[in-house]
Amino acid sequence: METAKLMKLGNGMSIPSVQELAKLTLAEIPSRYICTVENLQLPVGASVIDDHETVPVIDIENLISSEPVTEKLELDRLHSACKEWGFFQVVNHGVDTSLVDNVKSDIQGFFNLSMNEKIKYGQKDGDVEGFGQAFVASEDQTLDWADIFMILTLPLHLRKPHLFSKLPLPLRETIESYSSEMKKLSMVLFEKMEKALQVQAVEIKEISEVFKDMTQVMRMNYYPPCPQPELAIGLTPHSDFGGLTILLQLNEVEGLQIKNEGRWISVKPLPNAFVVNVGDVLEIMTNGMYRSVDHRAVVNSTKERLSIATFHDPNLESEIGPISSLITPNTPALFRSGSTYGELVEEFHSRKLDGKSFLDSMRM
């Protein structure tokens, strides 16, 4: 049975609101927000951020086309994007623009609430669901220059009653609709990935079956202006844990960067597009064929940035490991099997973010 223990998303600690801190117009940021050298936006010896390369773009209309040649070309693009980049943008995805506009305005409205209102949705001791910060594992840990609101949306019976049902009505209705649309989009991508991977017919549904009764979590991110952006980080470099993440940029301020061949590349969201990335669990299931990659959020000194990341992960009781038909004498298993997704959730969220350290712990 799925238990409340399995769905406690980590060990959150009470941290001051960065949004409120930014209102103090500080000349210098507190020491807890100063990054280690390797996590600075441009650490000594790092490659210059490349603004000329762009992540691949996948056209969903072509991906689901009834014309075999059109579908095959887009499948090849999807397969290449997952292997070479681990990130891509999707266009012509079918999500109504009015819903996207509501997501943008309602989340902005939430972060515009007074602190007294937002704290009603604050994280409980030992859990990161709610308003606060994620992945704070110790009192001396460097903190991200961001506030978040994290909420589990699927499965329905595991929603926290003190959170979802208490959200302001417009936001609650918007998140409900958005949750449904994101699940539909993610399932299209999972099913097409199966086809692109050309796994054996007996296992052709192995990926989509694992995600059919998915765990879905949303994280709304608020990155306020920072007086010393060169010393801070909005989101520590890391790879995502689960299956697929679908990110929506809520305003025009850029900040997402991905690591590709040792260089940090700024992602410039296309109009009416979503940014999608492969998570650690999907890398494990594809035995390393599809890549989860390090990414981070940087901040600036003048403008706030907002986004919402929707994580699409397996159901809690699914056993996670490489798909057996992808294991051959020439491609032996790279990752261990045997743990359920629920067990891995607890392990992952008990850590601080640290690159791909969790995935590395799963290697054979």
Curated annotation (Swiss-Prot):
Amino-acid positions noted as binding 2-oxoglutarate in the UniProt annotation, renumbered to this chain: R305
This protein's record includes keyword Manganese: no
Keyword list, A-Z: Dioxygenase, Iron, Metal-binding, Oxidoreductase, Transferase
Positions annotated to bind Fe cation: H238, D240, H295
Reactions performed catalytically: (S)-tetrahydropalmatine + S-adenosyl-L-methionine = (S)-cis-N-methyltetrahydropalmatine + S-adenosyl-L-homocysteine; (S)-canadine + S-adenosyl-L-methionine = (S)-cis-N-methylcanadine + S-adenosyl-L-homocysteine; an (S)-7,8,13,14-tetrahydroprotoberberine + S-adenosyl-L-methionine = an (S)-cis-N-methyl-7,8,13,14-tetrahydroprotoberberine + S-adenosyl-L-homocysteine; (S)-stylopine + S-adenosyl-L-methionine = (S)-cis-N-methylstylopine + S-adenosyl-L-homocysteine
Essential cofactor(s): Fe(2+)
Entry's EC annotation: 2.1.1.122, 1.14.11.-
Sequence ranges assigned to domain Fe2OG dioxygenase in this UniProt record: 214-314
GO MF annotations in UniProt: (S)-tetrahydroprotoberberine N-methyltransferase activity; dioxygenase activity; metal ion binding
Pfam families membership: 2OG-FeII_Oxy, DIOX_N
Cofactor note: Binds 1 Fe(2+) ion per subunit.
Taxonomic superkingdom: Eukaryota
UniProt keyword Oxidoreductase present: yes
Family: Belongs to the iron/ascorbate-dependent oxidoreductase family.
Miscellaneous information on this protein: No detectable effect on alkaloid content in RNAi specific mutant.
Record's function text: Non-heme dioxygenase that mediates dealkylation reactions such as regio- and substrate-specific O-demethylation and O,O-demethylenation in the metabolism of protopine, benzo[c]phenanthridine, and rhoeadine alkaloids; cleaves a methylenedioxy bridge leaving two hydroxyl groups. Catalyzes the O,O-demethylenation of methylenedioxy bridges on protoberberine alkaloids such as allocryptopine and protopine and the O-demethylation of cryptopine. No activity with (S)-reticuline, salutaridine, papaverine, (S)-corytuberine, oripavine, (S)-scoulerine, pavine, noscapine, codeine or thebaine.
Designated name of the protein: Protopine O-dealkylase
Organism whose genome encodes this protein: Papaver somniferum
